[in-house]
Amino acid sequence: MRRRFLLLSAPLSLAGCGSLLPAQKYIPRTSWPLQPQPPNYIPARANGPVLLVRTISPAPGLEQRGLQCLTPSGSLKTDYYNLWAVPPAEALTQGLINWAQASGHFSAVITPGSRLTPDLIIEGELSELLVDLATNQARAQMTVLIIKPALNVTGFAQPVTQAQLTATALVQGNTPGAQAAAQSEAVANLLTQVMVLLDRFSP
């Protein structure tokens, strides 16, 4: 009888062990926007070139949405409680479309699948978006390829230029919100460089 009592009480004892562990603190997740706005809006040129913006691809590790920082020791850390609202490469693609439309350089800015024929194509890869804690700076980096499409079905597309662009912004504070704001500013500075490049090679 005593043995049966011990066996029956064992699950209750094990269940009671859970109450001895400290309760895990709830940490809410926050989504931060990555939507740098163009500095101004200029109406489209009626006779301007047509720009095709291909989707910017993410470098390995940048497919995820967590904010990243580089520690003074050189290790990369990802914050899984502070996230971008959309993956950074997607946000950069949309930002490039918005900035190109607002620049006034182009009669139309299109994406793959459009029936319009482009005069210029841009594609690239987002290779870095983080806060460098050693310098207290946000840093954004991408590789850009600008292409002139083939003039006819028998022709070949011609790369016009390739460039690796880097932009920074000072982090004003030590909160996740300050880090997100600085990275957004760095992306805006990056897009400014891209627009200068596009203006240089626009027909």
Label each residue range with its predicted role.
Residues 19-32, 38-41, 98, 103-154:
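Surface-exposed short loop/turn segments
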